[in-house]
Amino acid sequence: KELIGFGMQEAALLGDILSRQREFVTDIRLFRGKRRKMTVNGVPAKNSAALSDVLHTVFFAPEDLFLIRAGAAERRRFMDLSLCQLRPRYAEALSQYNRLYEHKTRILRDSEDKPELLDLLPEFNEGLCRSGAVLIGYRARFCAALAEYARQAHYECSGERD
């Protein structure tokens, strides 16, 4: 729908595509409030899967680049939200890590008035290390799984070339 111009009711995407050493003529019609119509060499295509055999494309919208531009903190937040939904143990470890981090921060802040609080730091550091190790393990496996999906998607989009 984003491809239809402002104030317009429809848009057309026409293309001559050379794929698998054959030429294909595609015609895609987009309508506001109606289903799109697609043909490949004049034959109606039932769905976009019919086009994917002929045309390997990736469509990027500005919001797709958000994770790249937003920085590491936003990428970690995305990963945390994803992993919390997928792995309850990750959610527990993240919650524990955040709790320990907050306590340690309070100890450091209050230690000026109560220096004896600094004796508690080794215990909090150990807990942070344990929870952090669990988080790092889950994140590493998550990144490896995403990398495999990305590799496969790149392979398919590039016409099965590396």
What are these regions (language model features)?
Residues F66-G159:
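An accessory alpha-helical subdomain
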